Amino acid sequence: MSQAKNKNTGSTIALNKKARFDYHIVEKFEAGLALTGWEVKSLRAGKCQLVDSYVLLKDSEAWLLGAHITPLKEASTHVIADPTRTRKLLLHRRELNKLIGAVSQTGHTCVPLALYWKGNKVKCEIALVKGKKDFDKRETEKERDWNRQKQRVIRDHVKQ
């Protein structure tokens, strides 16, 4: 009897924390990614950054721009690896139509929030977002600080 392989199902590869801070999230979608072999190996090693990446909707297709996947030296020896190449996002037609209609409204855009494993497939969580104003960002920061203070008080009170 063979042993079961250790699969990293549902584990997060990369997060885009800046997007959660800079935007109000309206709706989330799960999209597949069209990748090459060296990119998958690099993602298994966790060599990915989503900061300053965004989703471009063009010709009824979705494309991931600005995501940086660092190539491994061992995996990309026979291929010229472009770490920031444009990657196609795989979505259902009705999801694409919904995104295209919403992005055409002023103030809305589409950004990636996370890359993660779902089984042996790489999925990208993208979100339809609306930009925050500076006072919204300050309000979010104040709320986060207040929650931390509450947790400290509760923790210190429970210790005594």
UniProtKB/Swiss-Prot annotation:
Main location: cytoplasm
Localization of this protein: Cytoplasm
Protein name: SsrA-binding protein
Keyword presence, Cytoplasm: yes
Function: Required for rescue of stalled ribosomes mediated by trans-translation. Binds to transfer-messenger RNA (tmRNA), required for stable association of tmRNA with ribosomes. tmRNA and SmpB together mimic tRNA shape, replacing the anticodon stem-loop with SmpB. tmRNA is encoded by the ssrA gene; the 2 termini fold to resemble tRNA(Ala) and it encodes a 'tag peptide', a short internal open reading frame. During trans-translation Ala-aminoacylated tmRNA acts like a tRNA, entering the A-site of stalled ribosomes, displacing the stalled mRNA.
Keywords: Cytoplasm, RNA-binding
Stretches the record annotates as Disordered: 134-160
Superkingdom: Bacteria
Gene3D superfamilies the UniProt entry points to: 2.40.280.10
Family: Belongs to the SmpB family.
CDD domains, per database record: SmpB
Species for this entry: Hahella chejuensis (strain KCTC 2396)
GO BP terms, alphabetized: trans-translation
InterPro entries, alphabetized: SmpB, SsrA-bd_prot, SsrA-bd_prot_CS
A GO cellular-component term linked to this record: cytosol
GO-annotated molecular function: RNA binding
